[in-house]
């Protein structure tokens, strides 16, 4: 298990989660096991982990051996957690590390990255609708809508038009084929100078989010999380782009205790609190240090939000 990577914002995650002996924590996005290992190594606690990617089952099996009676794994999307955990004792903490994992990006045959020429797949669960099916079957309007909505790509209409024109000549089946169509549509050098990213990046993000239904899964799970957490349990979420963070921020703020405004003439020196379930531990997002970004460039867009459940 020495090859397990150190996940982003590891120190910050542990600081906000503050795991202790004899408590139980949920790792919603097991991946290569980075967060689970940090938590289990920190104290004599238990971890329940979820991940829909069958490629991580072999890693999870190593945890069963190293942490007997302390680790449980479900090869399921975290949105299914309530189905498996609702009859168990409530959790003392939940951690989520969202988006595509480094392991998935680095496996060329998964089709998440245009750094390799591979089948255009992008399925986290390796089941269901492939990215290649979407780009070859969706209408130009559907393509533009998804690319704009989930990629926040201002040139979505132009990209969609080029995809439709290209697939009439030849089906789009590989990552580099799609990336080059996008680059041809919007240019490469000028786009990079303006945005500091490859011109295919936002479109690949959009298609991946759509194929895996990522944003609705996040929203659905966050709604479950308040039922799963015990009072004094902590919710830690790491996201990598504005669409994810907006959902998390809105959820936490909607469920947070709020100070009630009062007259400046009031003799009450303590601001009373409105009813709420969560206390925000991060008033602003936590972000990686310069050192972490240098050591792991993929961490540069990571942002962490944390909250404490204080009421049922």
From Swiss-Prot:
It is found in: Cytoplasm. Gene3D superfamilies: Putative methyltransferase TM0872, insert domain (1.10.150.170), Vaccinia Virus protein VP39 (3.40.50.150). GO terms for biological process: rRNA base methylation. GO terms for cellular component: cytoplasm. It catalyses: cytidine(1402) in 16S rRNA + S-adenosyl-L-methionine = N(4)-methylcytidine(1402) in 16S rRNA + S-adenosyl-L-homocysteine + H(+). Its EC number is 2.1.1.199. Pfam families: Methyltransf_5. One of its GO terms (molecular function) is rRNA (cytosine-N4-)-methyltransferase activity. S-adenosyl-L-methionine binds at residues 33-35, 51, 78, 97, 104. Keywords: Cytoplasm, Methyltransferase, rRNA processing, S-adenosyl-L-methionine, Transferase. The keyword ATP-binding does not apply. HAMAP family: 16SrRNA_methyltr_H. Specifically methylates the N4 position of cytidine in position 1402 (C1402) of 16S rRNA. Belongs to the methyltransferase superfamily. RsmH family. This is Ribosomal RNA small subunit methyltransferase H. It comes from Orientia tsutsugamushi (strain Ikeda) (Rickettsia tsutsugamushi). The lineage of its organism: Bacteria, Pseudomonadati, Pseudomonadota, Alphaproteobacteria, Rickettsiales. The gene is rsmH.
């Amino acid at each position: 298990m020495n090859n397990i990577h150190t996940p982003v914002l590891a120190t910050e995650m542990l600081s906000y989660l503050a795991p202790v002996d004899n408590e139980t924590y949920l790792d919603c996005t097991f991946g290569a096991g980075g967060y689970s290992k940090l938590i289990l190594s920190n104290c004599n606690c238990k971890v329940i982990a979820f991940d829909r990617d069958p490629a991580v089952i072999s890693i999870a099996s190593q945890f069963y051996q190293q942490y007997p009676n302390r680790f449980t794994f479900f090869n399921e999307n975290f949105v299914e957690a309530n189905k498996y955990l609702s009859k168990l004792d409530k959790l003392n903490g939940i951690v989520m590390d969202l988006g595509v994992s480094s392991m998935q990006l680095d496996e060329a045959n998964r089709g998440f990255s245009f750094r390799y020429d591979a089948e255009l797949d992008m399925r986290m669960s390796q089941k269901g609708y492939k990215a290649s099916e979407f780009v070859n079957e969706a209408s130009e309007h559907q393509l533009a809508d998804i690319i704009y909505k989930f990629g926040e790509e201002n040139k979505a209409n132009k990209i969609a038009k080029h995809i439709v024109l290209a697939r009439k000549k030849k089906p789009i089946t590989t990552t580099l084929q799609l990336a080059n169509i996008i680059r041809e549509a919007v240019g490469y050098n000028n786009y990079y100078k303006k945005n500091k990213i490859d011109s295919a990046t936002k479109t690949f993000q959009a298609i991946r989010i759509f194929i895996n239904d990522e944003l609705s899964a996040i929203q659905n799970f966050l709604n479950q999380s308040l039922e799963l957490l015990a009072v004094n349990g902590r919710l830690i979420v790491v996201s990598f782009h504005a669409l994810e963070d907006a959902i998390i921020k809105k959820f936490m703020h909607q469920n947070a205790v709020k100070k009630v405004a009062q007259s400046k003439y009031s003799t009450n020196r303590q601001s009373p609190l409105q009813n709420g379930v969560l206390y925000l531990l991060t008033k602003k997002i936590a972000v990686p240090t310069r050192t972490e970004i240098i050591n792991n460039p993929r961490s540069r867009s990571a942002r962490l939000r944390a909250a404490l459940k204080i009421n049922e």
